[in-house]
Curated annotation (Swiss-Prot):
EC number: 4.1.99.17
MF-aspect GO terms: 4 iron, 4 sulfur cluster binding; carbon-carbon lyase activity; zinc ion binding
Gene that produces this protein: thiC
Iron-sulfur found in the keyword field: yes
Annotated stretches, region: Disordered: 618-642
Residues that coordinate or bind Zn(2+): H433, H497
Binding, substrate: N235, M264, Y293, H329, S349, R350, G351, D390, G391, M392, R393, E429, Y456
Pathway assigned in UniProt: Cofactor biosynthesis; thiamine diphosphate biosynthesis
Keyword set includes 4Fe-4S: yes
Name listed for the protein in its UniProt record: Phosphomethylpyrimidine synthase
NCBIfam families from the UniProt entry: PRK09284.1, PRK13352.1, thiC
Pfam family, one: ThiC_Rad_SAM
Enzyme's top EC category: lyase
Amino acid sequence: MSNRRETRAQAQQFIDNLKPLQHPNSEKVYLEGSRPDLKVGMRQIHQSDTLVAGDEANPVFEANPPLKVYDCAGAYSDPDANIDVRKGLEKFRENWIEERGDTVQLTSASSGFTQQRLADDGLDHLRFESLLPPRRAKEGKRVTQLHYARQGIITPEMEYIAIRENMAKSEVTDPILTQKDKGESFGAVIGEPITAEFVRQEIARGRAIIPLNINHPEAEPMIIGRNFLVKVNANIGNSAVTSSIEEEVEKLVWSTRWGADTVMDLSTGRYIHETREWIIRNSPVPIGTVPIYQALEKVNGVAEDLNWETFRDTLIEQAEQGVDYFTIHAGVLLRYVPMTAKRLTGIVSRGGSIMAKWCLSHHKENFLYEHFREICEICAAYDVSLSLGDGMRPGSIADANDEAQFSELETLGKLVKVAWEYDVQTIIEGPGHIPMNLIKENMDKQLEVCDEAPFYTLGPQTTDIAPGYDHFTSGIGAAMIAWYGCAMLCYVTPKEHLGLPNKDDVKQGLIAYKIAAHAGDVAKGHPSAQIRDNALSKARFEFRWEDQYNLGLDPETARAYHDESLPQESAKVAHFCSMCGPKFCSMKITQEVRDYAAAQEREAEARVIDIKSATEYDSYTGSESDTAKRASQREQGMAQMSAEFKAKGAELYHEASHKQPDVALED
């Protein structure tokens, strides 16, 4: 069997046998809102107890409470869920959409292309089985979360998000876990706690978006904005030369397991329409696309043959399938294209290069720019958010922050205000390849010219010397720009610039970017961010190895690394690791120092009482003989302590009476 067939067969087997999967020592829990159908899924990590006193025969333990953390996996982490990818996930938002009374269910698809695909019997074997008629806004209505927010309406989606973003912080009372630095937010103002009204205000202001198409009721509400947790997007999608529907569905599920807040389907090969349907129906997270990719497929890959009619039909096709946000390269203007001629790497954005070629071949203005108001009308009818693409982003650090990049950014700033006229939720895409010293300029300029609309960046990549490790080179920039105010980070995998990522690449990219996002949250002072850090640090100091693994982003890898050098089960309770060993473990020594210091403090208090009594008996007169007497007493005391030290073996540290005995490792 060829590698391609084997990979596809493995993906098919994954789908056929798909069951909910939980991380170690975790369970799915639900926090209830103000109505019975509003239940917010979280992952609850259980911890072991801490030994605080007693001896081996009578130990005294202190409980460590379970910790609730953000969970992107939806039903895929709920053991009670009935998973069937051929039927899709539960449409739990359907009732919320229907009860608003501002949408209508269509009798058939509006897109001509969709109608052609449905009429093609040759596609039956690829088609998703449980198709439902699409919805759109009633005539004269706008059904976007931005529209509701501006009307002062708090939707169930907004309440859901408020509960989710707080991560049950109110349940954490241990000051060891709640301690945090105030952070440096660079102007961001984060609610504490985050309320549904705060969510509504941020949406109404345009500083945040809730990307939820009315035709994607399976998606769990989430928010993208600088005053909330930094989010991470994962890219998947087939190409003309590799991957399949089965593999992309597998990557979707895999992405949500490892923390993808949104997923972009960047498919460019055959069966784009069918692949997307399978992905959306099985996705608990918002799905984004770049519609120009499919429009190009419809004109046989000839950029010059693109036209507004084909693109418009593609927007409607995807909106009625349930795509939650579109990347639109409407800022690539004809006059900006010559600015890229002196660049080292030219135009590296696929969508940007397509539109640049169209503009030059016709010597006309970008038709996406010319028809932008019509694009907004379509989005307002389905609540599709816009992600204004950075077609002029730099593809090397040599091209960073140049005239072409910032000219486009200023155009995007104007377009976001047009989108807001139509109550269309909008974010701005950013670079790219930017050295560390130029990253903050990008963030500051975006906030200024785009009126604080959420920023969504690819990295940025801080150096160009490490193909195969660009999840590192870009993770550095991602952490920095997340701190400065970026709302969502698009992950980069080890395969960036080299090939299409597989499952493991997706995981590696996501872990790198979840680290970057979390580091940004901690640095800007998000109220709930540092609790998990503190819990893991406490577990580490107390040698609770299993808790260290389970509180981390990737428990399996942490456990595997530990077991490489200390595979014995007894090592899971040992008070050292293989890095320093039992004699030089800094945390073990620190614990002994604390115990020794506490014992000395108790002894000192007792001696102070004795000295005070003696002094009162033999009152101080200030004479030279008394001074000499006190000096002699001090010397005698020091000599006594020296003798005691030697008598106890001349060891620097001694075992504390309540310390758990060392465990002898098996050979």
